[in-house]
Amino acid sequence: MTESSFKLAIVVSQFNRAVTEKLLNGVLQRLTELGVQANQIKTVWVPGAVEIPLLAKRLAKSKHYQAVVCLGAVIRGETDHYNYVCQQVSFGCQQVALEYEVPIIFGVLTTTTKEQAFARAGGERGNKGADWADAAVSMIKLMKEIEITDE
């Protein structure tokens, strides 16, 4: 399987958009470097991180995409909301991957401060989006290599 023979989707949270746009750019730039064309990628924006798993499920269920990259930035505030959001999003994404056997790449930053988020979205810690693009392509290849046929 070559990079020009598959399709993937990206689900991006609009909340903390200044961070998530940078993560998206990191994913798209790396995919381009790997030879993936724009017509192989579908990008969908959702209101917040909690909405990511539902759209990931819809995309995985469609069987049109060999991987779904989920991007978000959950930054700790003064309440417990952060804990609930992080848990729901990570669990939801994992459930989708297991139910549909489609790689769901968990590209949701969970940080204590905005500075930590920006550092990982093209700042001094690099752009994690590139790492998640690599993970998506790697998982697509592994899933194809270990393909199980129904008998």
UniProtKB/Swiss-Prot annotation:
CDD domains in alphabetical order: Lumazine_synthase-I
Gene Ontology cellular-component terms listed: cytoplasm; cytosol; riboflavin synthase complex
Superkingdom of origin organism: Bacteria
Annotated 5-amino-6-(D-ribitylamino)uracil binding sites: 15, 49-51, 73-75, 106
Source organism (scientific name): Coxiella burnetii (strain RSA 493 / Nine Mile phase I)
GO molecular function terms listed in the Swiss-Prot or TrEMBL record: 6,7-dimethyl-8-ribityllumazine synthase activity
Catalytic activities: (2S)-2-hydroxy-3-oxobutyl phosphate + 5-amino-6-(D-ribitylamino)uracil = 6,7-dimethyl-8-(1-D-ribityl)lumazine + phosphate + 2 H2O + H(+)
Functional description taken from the UniProt entry: Catalyzes the formation of 6,7-dimethyl-8-ribityllumazine by condensation of 5-amino-6-(D-ribitylamino)uracil with 3,4-dihydroxy-2-butanone 4-phosphate. This is the penultimate step in the biosynthesis of riboflavin.
Active site feature: 81 (proton donor)
Top EC class for this record: transferase
Complexes and interactors: Forms an icosahedral capsid composed of 60 subunits, arranged as a dodecamer of pentamers.
GO BP terms: riboflavin biosynthetic process
Family: Belongs to the DMRL synthase family.
Keyword line: Riboflavin biosynthesis, Transferase
Name of this chain's protein: 6,7-dimethyl-8-ribityllumazine synthase
EC number, as in UniProt: 2.5.1.78
Residues the entry annotates as binding (2S)-2-hydroxy-3-oxobutyl phosphate: 78-79, 120
Pfam families: DMRL_synthase
Pathway in which this enzyme or protein is active: Cofactor biosynthesis; riboflavin biosynthesis; riboflavin from 2-hydroxy-3-oxobutyl phosphate and 5-amino-6-(D-ribitylamino)uracil: step 1/2
Key word Acyltransferase present: no
